[in-house]
Every structure is written in C-alpha cells, then in structure tokens.
Amino acid sequence: MKQIIQKYDQPGTWEVVLPFTKVGQEQTWTGIIDARQPGVYELTVVATHTAQGTRGRITVRAVCGAGARVAVRGLIRIAKEAQDTEDFLELRILTLGKTALATAEPELEIEANQVKASHAASVGPVDEEQLLYLMSRGLGRAEAVDTIVRGFLA
C-alpha cells in the first residue's frame, strides 16, 4: 500500500487531491499540521474514487496554538462506477490555549451502492487528566503539554 505523509508548519492554504483511478489501487495519506505559531492554516483534502475496488485511508492531525486558526476540510468522493471501494477519513485537532480556533469538516459524497466509507472528527483541548498524570511524574506543565503534543502528532 502506498503511504504518503505531509507536514505543514507555516501558515498557509493547501489543497491535496488524491485520485484513485486504477482498479484495486490502495493508498494511505497522512497530513500533520503544527500550528503552534500564530496565523491561518487551511487544508483541504479530496479523495476521488473512480475505479472499482480501491482502498484509502486519510488522516489529518493538527495542533492549534494560541493565536492560530486551523480549518481542515476532508472529502471522500466515490463515483457510481467505483463499486467495492473502502475509505476512511479521520480529522483530529488538538487546541492549545483559549485563543486557538479550529474547525474540522469531514464530508462523504457516495454515488456507488457497494462501498464502505466513513469519517470521524474531533476538536478539543489537551486532556487535563493526562496533564496531571505527567505532572505527578515530575514534568512541569509546559513540558507535559509538549510531551502530549509530540505523542499526538507522531
């Protein structure tokens, strides 16, 4: 299976198009957005399945720091002729600070009737229990947050 990982760590706007045009084509795509610097980070990912029996998995993980705005949109499009296709879209954004703004918008457009396609999305702050646990092991708050962020983006 073809695997692609792309990282974004500067403000900007990106569009990624993933065409699935060959019968049985398989691909995994992962996008990592490190938006700990202020600015606007916008990512759109579109997977278009036009061949039968294709398999995909799209994952976006983002960290949104204070003063940053992250907008992630993902779309899985499955054409009528792309029967027996499977794809999963996952968008996860971790917010750091009260001024971090983030949105995750997963979408499915399915014209075929023999497919497996789904999505998941979440936007939220660092889990306070995880922070307290790491701090009880001797880490300072900033170091604990950094440890959680590194694990989340890995």
Locations of regions flagged by a protein language model:
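Conserved beta-strand/loop scaffold segments within soluble protein domains that form the structured core
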Residues: 1-139, 149-154
